[in-house]
């Protein structure tokens, strides 16, 4: 693998070299690598249009959907830092991380597994949180389409932001489980976040000929890095599953 070890650079390269190859397949929507890059750039423009600057933290609190993949890559393309949140967090637990990271944008889930945790957030206790975008899951309660229809920045600005990202820039902050105390945010650079899954994929002999069913949650290192970022670098087709369902998986 050659070129800059940043998520935007890898996506650009894969969109060029594997343009018509399936990158992401779900029951709702599918993308080739070229289509995925186009969607990521449009979403990054919408993110930047909300006033999100390079270096800002953007949280994703949602299960495995195509929106998660697009949002993740778009956050990086906009020069921002991804903060994944566990879908089983209570609103109080999620709020603690949102407060500590001072995230101005949360891309969250609509009603999921009978609960609406995003609606339970105490916005008054989160002064930095200016925007919430809801991904529709169990009902028609999402705001993703409205978010995408909003006024974004020009794609030329998005491309400039993506090109400005460097390998040693922070790409994500993943919080520990807090088994022995308060959870701690672990900062990883683009170089780190891409190198580890590339090595893992090489050991597992993952190639563009593979179709990768990802049941592991994207909010965890396994689903995010050994899933999304491994597929991104190898050309394997990512097939995410919302929650584990043996019959559906088979």
PLM-predicted stretches and their roles:
Residues 49-50, 77-146:
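Structural core segment of the AMP-binding/adenylate-forming
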Residues 4, 19, 134, 152-175, ...:
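Conserved pre-ATP/AMP-binding loop-to-beta segment of ANL
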